[in-house]
């Protein structure tokens, strides 16, 4: 079941759902708008000959922060990691789905490549997989609305929520745009 605006507000008011900083004007009929943080991870395409998800490649990305009051410019065909300004904390019986903003999609901005699902129990910034599929650069302003978080009620609380030792969670408590940790549980079989 998708939560409505009144259900989202109720979950926040009793402290079960955390969105920090929270701005009530960001609540939509069935989602909460989230904003773009000011840090980005860009790929160092001269450090490695290829990306191998089986290997730890610590220098694959570099953290970039635009100058105060300046945007980050995402060029056509470029892919970078960003993150939400908000830290989101989900209880064990709510899952999240991050969706892009329609107005930004119409400009050629993709908010996530594949990872739009947020497990129950997750807490941290949500990493964004930002791509420009337009033929012109797109300016990304820290603090701008970048997506919307939809919340789904589970049929029961997760037995092993994200962050539990049984779940094998790699990104619990992440701050800022977090690079891939695929190598931690990579399996060739």
Swiss-Prot record:
GO molecular function ontology, one term from the record: dCTP deaminase (dUMP-forming) activity
EC number: 3.5.4.30
Site (Important for bifunctional activity) residue list: 116-117
Residues binding dCTP: 101-106, 119, 127-129, 148, 162, 174
Pfam families, per the entry: DCD
Subunit: Homotrimer.
This protein's name: dCTP deaminase, dUMP-forming
Organism expressing this protein natively: Rhodococcus erythropolis (strain PR4 / NBRC 100887)
